[in-house]
Structures are given as structure tokens and as C-alpha cells.
Swiss-Prot record:
Protein task: Sulfurates the molybdenum cofactor. Sulfation of molybdenum is essential for xanthine dehydrogenase (XDH) and aldehyde oxidase (ADO) enzymes in which molybdenum cofactor is liganded by 1 oxygen and 1 sulfur atom in active form. Modulates cold stress- and osmotic stress-responsive gene expression by acting as key regulator of abscisic acid (ABA) biosynthesis.
UniProt superkingdom: Eukaryota
Protein name per the record: Molybdenum cofactor sulfurase
Record organism: Arabidopsis thaliana
Domain MOSC: 650-817
């Protein structure tokens, strides 16, 4: 920390503030002492505990009323709302004579309001920077629908003094991309261009990269448009209005509207001080507000209306004209306390504090190297790391590379960060233009990715050797050096490959070396293997039952994962979402043809006949991972039982054996499913999961050696923690990794490779209580990671023998064919 303070000590920690950063953390963010490192302030910053105390003291000490009423309390509430508007305008240094503050449900609603009320004509143009949020891109739909043109642009700065006029014009240039039009027959006459209104939109700070845009764009687009747009088809267009998306940037450096008089500015208050959510604002120049065309009217926006004839007289004040319905007056009351907090620290001090942390992290990531000298990190955004430049906000966006130059998937980073208590964000952050621009993804690649099944928030982080998104960390006013340091330490320990010493003392590049252990030394021959246990899981994500002997079929173990529980919105319910599903016990009596289910939450056991008319085929369809299946809907009593057992509305579905069924994950998640050649029920990846007792024993040794507290607090892991179908005994730890095929008794299986583990194995069921921790996944991640996957256990496909009825039994010999 000494080196950090030497460089940033004058800027970090609020040295001139009422409290320094440590005092702020100790008194207002005690909840972060539980090991949470929160680095997603670009998504939402955190509320202060002191801030919330003030808010709820206000709520419990005062009475608030609907501002549309005329009582004393309602009038006082109206005055409070007016004061809040002034606070917002003051924060942006905007005069009430020039601007009005309209409260909305968020920045997105504010942008939508601009889009739907802007005076579009077929001669209008909508220009927007590539680095814009989807909520800004959505305005394009309104423009194109009215026959206007739309075009994405890139901003180029040619000099060190942005906006200054030179002999060749201003140093800022707007470079346009393809022009989009739906009315291709439209003719742009020069005289009509002069009468139409046009809109230019840009963010004060890019939420993808943290790049801060030069606010001189406001004046240049309004006063020097022809030169700035020189060479584009828009250079002759007049009457440009400017919209700034300040949702990301205003938390640390709000635009000064007295100097940069944008026509529209949008924000969300949870980005500023964490609470309230669901409240934003549109700051609109009063002269611009007069041009907006609003169709709908509502309570609060009319002076008078007549129900049975076409007559309405609207209110004239800007706020009353545009704000439909009753204002969210309690949320508006809460923002006063948030602004009080920001004012005590000052935006300039917050800017210096947060940006010093982001610059520190960027420098550390830039310098990070693998053991072979290859760079670990690729950064996106401004390369200027001077705090005084104001070129970049407190955001660091990057991707990580392996020593061989291939990419770590961003989901791997997110998974491991979560295990380390670090909360960050991955993907494209709803900013497709910036994402494509920085990742150098062409239109054909973007379309190809979509055709391959890639959509927002899915698992496809690397396609055709290129990342589809990135990793983002961002800092807020309460972030500390310790947060930044823990993040850097995490990156180094998890992704930077150190030099590795070999037995003869030479150094080579390595990654996740095996821990020294006599048990891991190679042996000349394998001891005998045998099948230790068999477990059938009739209902996906519920508890299974062990058997001594069980029949095999085309889908694996008979009735394994043949049922699943579906939520009301169509999602598959699993232990990831509902950990209590592990408490639901199951058993199948083959002779009686009964599936029995029990739960501590239900008094009676549930009995379901496996062959029964209670499964009535219906016309509705269930779409799971792009596979259309026929629903087998259970009786009302069965669905009611599962609703009580799980604690949410749901229904039980059975896989239709008459349907030719491929892997659940085909198409939607390329590469996730290993078993594309055979039929499976509701399993994720393959028919069988095999776990080795010896591998589990080695994992237990590592856990005990790593953490004495863990050893005292937890029992040794049981192989069934990993939900295997088959547990084997014998052999060496992880010997199953090398299997190509395996024969168990008289049955043949093909190895499909390792099983990719997730946080589900961190859920334990001890004495009927569901508990979550970071283990064993954290320890497995330290030595079982292979190209973004944490592998433990082996997936198998059963090579069915159609000529005979096949069974598998405990105690049978296991004979692997090793690669």
C-alpha cells in the first residue's frame, strides 16, 4: 500500500473530507466486513447504512401524502418533491430557468420518453455513438418508424485540446457508419432538412469501457454541426438536439449543464447512491420540452377533461405535462439523504478517490505476465492513465489470456471470483456497440454467434476462438485499496501462470501444478477397481436412492432423471435455484411400479404410479434448451404436493419415452453437452456420472491441508455430494481422467470426459439443513481447471446391447481401457 499512497495519497481516501475512507467503511458499510468485495458499481452502487437510517427515520417520523391531494400533508409532500427537483438540478449545475427535472422510473424510462415524444419526421436524423447502452439504441425504433434516418458514429479526437477550432476545423470529428432507413424511397431535400429536428445521443461515460466522452460535443453539434459532420450525409442537417446518457458517469463526474447545455440528460438514482431503485430522472431544457409531442394523458397531467366528448386541457408546467400518475413520492423523499451524503464528500473528491483505484488496477493488470513472458490481460478503453486527464471513469474492462495466447472465458473468471467473494460483472453489459468495437467482432461474426445460440446472459463466452464479452470491475465512493488489492491478488493466483521448476531445477511455464503427494505418484500397475455403489435420481435435482442392482436402458439407468420440476414461468427448477430440493427423497419400487416421494415439509408421502393414466398428454409444449418435448402433466394433487415441498408454485413433468430426445443442451449451449449420440432423459450432459472414491479422498486431504477451520467445522466429503450414478473403489486418484472406455461387469461404456462442476456441489444437506459454502469448488478450481471448466468425475455413455436385458450391480469388476 505504501507505493500506492506515494502515487495517489493526495487523492485517495477523502483526506480533506468529514470522514476518511476507513471511517466510512467502519461506520457505514459494516456489512462488507463479511468478506464481500463489491466491484460492480457501474451496475449499481451500494447504499450507506447511515443513509438508510436517515431515510427510515424520516419515514417513521413524518407523514407523507399523495401530492395530487390538497391536504396539508399532501401539500407538504408536493413541496418536498419540488425541493428534490432543485437538488437534482443543482447536482448538474443546471438553472431552473433553463431546465426542468422530470422524475421517471429510471434512466431507461427517461430515454423511452424522449424517443416517443421527439418530433420525428421523415427528414429527421438520429445519430448515436457506437458506445451506447441498449436503452439508447431503442430510440432508433421510434426514429425509423417515423421514416427518419439512424446512424451509429465513432468520435475521433485529433488534438490535445478537444473542441478547439483549428485551421481545418474542430479537433473532434464524427465518423459515420452505415445509414439505416426503413423508408428507402425518402428524398432529403435541403430545404426540408433545415426544418426537421435531429437528435444526437452519447454517454458521458461508456458503461462498457469507462471511456469518458468529451462534453464539447454538446456545443459542437449545436453550433458547428457542418464542420463536425463534414463528409457525412448529415452535414447539411440543422436543428440538432443533444441527449447525454449520464446514468454511468454522473456518480463520479456529473456533466456541468451550465457549461455543456445538452437538451436532454438521463440518470438513475441507484447508480448515484444505491437507494432508491426504480427512480430516475430526465433533465430537459425548457425550450426543448416545448417541442416534444406527447399523446397520452393521465391523472395529474390534465387541467380538465370531459369523459364523453373529445376534450382535454393539459397542464402547462413541464413536470405536470409529462409526469403521468402520482409521483413516487416516498422514493423521491429518499433521494434527499443520498444527495446529502454525496455533497459531504463532494463529486470531485469521489472522482479522485475512485479513479485512483481504477488506475492502480489498470497498471497492475498491464504489467502482469505469465511465466513465459506472455501478457495475462488485454484492457479495453482509454490508454491514458493520468488521473488529471478525465479520459476514463473508475471502470476497468478486460479479458484474460492463457500462456499460449488462447482466451480464458469470462464466465470462468466470474465463477472463480464469486468463490473468492468478489462480485464483478461479465458479458457485454447491454452495450453491443462498444462490445463489438473493442472485441473487434464483425457483423458476420456477431450474426454467426447468434446463429450458434449465443444470446445475452448465456454461457457462450468464447466462440471460434474469440471472446463474446469481457470482464468489468468498477469502483464506488466507498471502495478501498484493500478491495482493489484483493482483486489483483485473485487474478494473479487464479490466472497468471508462474514459472514452474522441474526436478532438475530448470524452469518452464506451468499452470496449476499438482500438489506433492505420495498418493499422486504414478504407479506401474493399477489395483483392481470395483463398483462400490449405484444411485438413481428419478427427479432432477432431488435426492436419489441407492440400489444393489438396477436395470439399464437406452437412456442409462432405468427411470434416472425421468421427471423434473418446472416453475410457473416455464423454467427448470434445480438446486441452484431451490437448494431445498435436495431434501426431497425419492424411491422406486420396480415390482409395484411406484415412485415414492417424501419431504419433511409434507405430512404424507407421495406415491405416483409409473405406468398410469394420470399422465395425460396435452397439447402444450415444453421447450427446454431448444428441444421441444411433450408434457406429461400430473394430477393437481401431485403438483400441490411439490408446491408445498419446494415452497413455490410448480408442477412435475415426466419425460415422454415416445419422444426421440437429444441432449437438453443441444443448440442453446454448444459444447456443453457431451452426449450427442444417444438418448438421455433430463440429465444435463450425459447418461452417467462416475466418481472415484480415491479422487474424493485426495480432495479431502487437500481440503484439510488447506484450512484447519474447515477440517474442524465439516465432515469429510462423501462421494455422493457430487450426485454420481456410479461410485468406484480402487485405482489411483484421477485415474479415471485417462479412461477411453470402461467395462463394468458385462456392460460397456464410453468415456465422454470430465464433468464440469458448478456451485451446486457447494450445497450440503447436514441433518436436514441446507448449507452453502465456497467448498469444495474453490479447492477444485485450484488444481482441476481445464480451459475454463472445473472438472471432477467422469461422464459415461452406455453402449446398449439390444439383444439382452442388461443389469448393473454393486461389486462388479471395473475394467478401464486407458488412453
Amino acid at each position: 500500500m505504501e507505493a500506492f499512497l506515494k502515487e495517489f495519497g493526495d487523492y485517495y481516501g477523502y483526506p480533506d473530507g468529514p470522514k476518511n475512507i476507513q471511517e466510512i467503511r467502519d461506520t457505514e458499510f459494516k456489512r462488507l466486513d463479511k468478506g464481500v468485495v463489491y466491484l460492480d458499481h457501474a451496475g449499481s452502487t451500494l447504499y450507506s447504512e447511515l443513509q438508510m437510517e436517515y431515510i427510515f427515520k424520516d419515514f417513521t417520523s413524518n407523514v407523507f401524502g399523495n401530492p395530487h391531494s390538497q391536504s396539508d400533508i399532501s401539500s407538504a409532500t408536493s413541496d418536498l418533491i419540488a425541493d428534490a427537483r432543485h437538488q437534482v438540478l443543482e447536482y448538474f449545475n443546471a438553472s431552473p430557468e433553463d431546465y426542468s427535472c422530470l422524475f421517471t422510473s429510471g434512466a431507461t424510462a427517461a430515454l423511452k420518453l424522449v424517443g416517443e415524444t421527439f418530433p420525428w419526421t421523415q427528414d429527421s436524423n438520429f445519430l448515436y455513438t457506437m458506445e451506447n447502452h441498449n436503452s439508447v439504441l431503442g430510440i432508433r425504433e421510434y426514429a425509423l418508424a417515423q421514416g427518419a434516418s439512424a446512424c451509429a458514429v465513432d468520435i475521433e479526437e485529433a488534438a490535445n485540446q478537444p473542441g478547439q477550432l483549428t485551421n481545418s476545423g474542430p479537433s473532434i470529428k464524427v465518423k459515420h457508419r452505415a445509414v439505416q432507413m426503413r423508408n428507402t424511397s425518402k428524398l432529403q431535400k435541403e430545404e426540408s432538412r433545415g426544418n426537421a429536428y435531429n437528435l444526437f445521443a452519447f454517454p458521458s461515460e461508456c458503461n462498457f469501457s469507462g471511456l469518458r466522452f468529451n462534453l464539447d460535443l454538446v456545443k459542437l453539434m449545436k453550433e458547428n454541426t457542418e464542420t463536425v459532420l463534414q463528409g457525412s450525409p448529415f452535414s447539411k442537417s440543422k436543428r440538432w438536439m443533444v441527449l447525454i446518457d449520464a446514468a454511468k458517469g454522473c456518480a463520479t463526474l456529473p456533466p456541468d449543464l451550465s457549461e455543456y447545455p445538452a437538451d436532454f440528460v438521463v440518470l438513475s438514482f441507484y447508480k448515484l447512491f444505491g437507494y432508491p431503485t426504480g427512480l430516475g430522472a430526465l433533465l430537459v431544457r425548457n425550450d426543448a420540452a416545448k417541442l416534444l409531442k406527447k399523446t397520452y394523458f393521465s391523472g395529474g397531467t390534465v387541467a380538465a377533461s370531459i369523459a364523453d366528448i373529445d376534450f382535454v386541457k393539459r397542464r402547462e408546467r413541464v413536470e405536470e405535462f409529462f409526469e403521468d400518475g402520482s409521483a413516487s413520492f416516498l422514493s423521491i423523499a429518499a433521494i434527499r439523504h443520498g444527495f446529502k451524503l454525496l455533497k459531504s464528500l463532494t463529486p470531485s473528491a469521489i472522482w479522485m478517490h475512485t479513479t485512483s483505484l481504477s488506475i492502480y488496477v489498470k497498471k497492475k493488470l498491464q504489467a502482469l505476465r505469465h511465466g513465459n513472458g506472455a501478457a495475462v490481460c488485454v484492457l479495453y478503453g482509454s490508454e491514458n492513465l493520468e488521473l488529471s486527464s478525465h479520459k476514463s471513469g473508475p471502470t476497468v474492462t478486460f479479458n484474460l489470456k492463457r500462456p499460449d495466447g488462447s482466451w480464458f472465458g469470462y464466465l470462468e473468471v466470474e465463477k472463480l471470483a464469486s468463490l473468492s467473494g468478489i462480485q464483478l460483472r461479465t458479458g457485454c453489459f447491454c452495450n453491443p456497440g462498444a462490445c463489438a468495437k473493442y472485441l473487434e467482432l464483425s457483423h458476420s461474426e456477431l450474426r454467426s454467434n447468434v446463429e450458434a445460440g449465443h444470446i445475452c446472459w448465456d454461457d457462450n463466452d468464447v466462440i471460434n476462438g474469440k471472446p463474446t464479452g469481457a470482464v468489468r470491475v468498477s469502483f464506488g465512493y466507498m471502495s478501498t485499496f484493500e478491495d482493489a488489492k484483493k482483486f489483483i491478488d485473485f487474478i494473479i493466483s487464479s490466472f497468471a501462470s508462474p514459472p514452474k521448476k522441474t526436478g532438475n531445477g530448470t524452469v518452464v511455464s506451468g499452470r496449476f501444478p499438482q500438489l506433492p503427494s505420495e498418493d499422486l505418484e504414478s504407479k506401474e500397475s493399477f489395483p483392481s477397481h470395483y463398483l462400490k455403489s449405484i444411485t438413481v435420481y428419478p427427479i432432477k435435482s432431488c435426492a436419489g436412492f441407492s440400489v444393489i442392482r438396477w436395470p439399464l436402458c437406452r437412456t442409462g439407468l432405468l427411470h434416472d432423471r425421468e421427471w423434473m420440476v418446472q416453475g410457473l414461468t416455464g423454467e427448470i427448477l434445480t438446486q441452484k435455484k431451490v437448494p431445498e430440493m435436495s431434501l426431497i427423497k425419492t424411491f422406486i419400487d420396480l415390482e409395484e411400479g411406484l415412485l415414492s416421494v417424501e419431504s419433511s415439509r409434507c405430512e404424507d408421502k407421495l406415491h405416483i404410479r409409473i405406468k398410469s393414466d394420470s399422465y395425460n398428454p396435452r397439447n402444450d409444449e415444453f421447450d427446454s434448451h431448444a428441444n421441444i418435448l411433450e408434457n406429461r402433466n400430473e394430477e393437481t394433487r401431485i403438483n400441490r404436493w411439490f408446491t408445498n415441498a419446494i415452497g413455490r408454485q410448480c408442477k412435475l413433468l415426466r419425460y415422454s419415452s415416445s419422444t426421440s430426445k437429444d441432449c437438453l443442451n443441444r443448440n442453446k449451449s454448444p459444447g456443453l453437452c457431451r452426449d450427442l449420440e444417444s438418448n438421455i432423459n433430463f440429465a444435463n450432459e450425459a447418461q452417467f456420472l462416475l466418481i472415484s472414491e480415491e479422487s474424493v479422498a485426495d480432495l479431502n486431504r487437500r481440503l484439510e491441508a488447506k484450512d484447519e477451520d474447515y477440517k474442524r467445522a465439516h465432515e469429510k466429503l462423501n462421494p455422493h455430494r457430487f450426485r454420481p450414478n456410479l461410485v468406484i473403489s480402487g485405482g489411483e486418484p484421477y485415474g479415471e481422467d485417462k479412461w477411453k472406455t470402461v467395462k463394468i461387469g458385462d456392460n460397456h461404456f464410453t468415456s465422454l470426459g470430465g464433468c464440469n462442476r458448478c456451485q451446486m456441489i457447494n450445497i450440503s444437506n447436514e441433518a436436514g439443513l441446507v448449507k452453502k459454502s465456497n467448498e469444495p469448488l474453490t479447492t477444485l478450481a485450484s488444481y482441476r481447471r481445464v480451459k475454463g471448466k472445473i472438472l471432477f468425475g467422469t461422464l459415461l455413455r452406455y453402449e446398449i446391447d439390444e439383444k439382452r436385458q442388461c443389469w448393473i450391480g454393486v461389486g462388479e469388476e471395473v475394467n478401464p481401457d486407458i488412453e
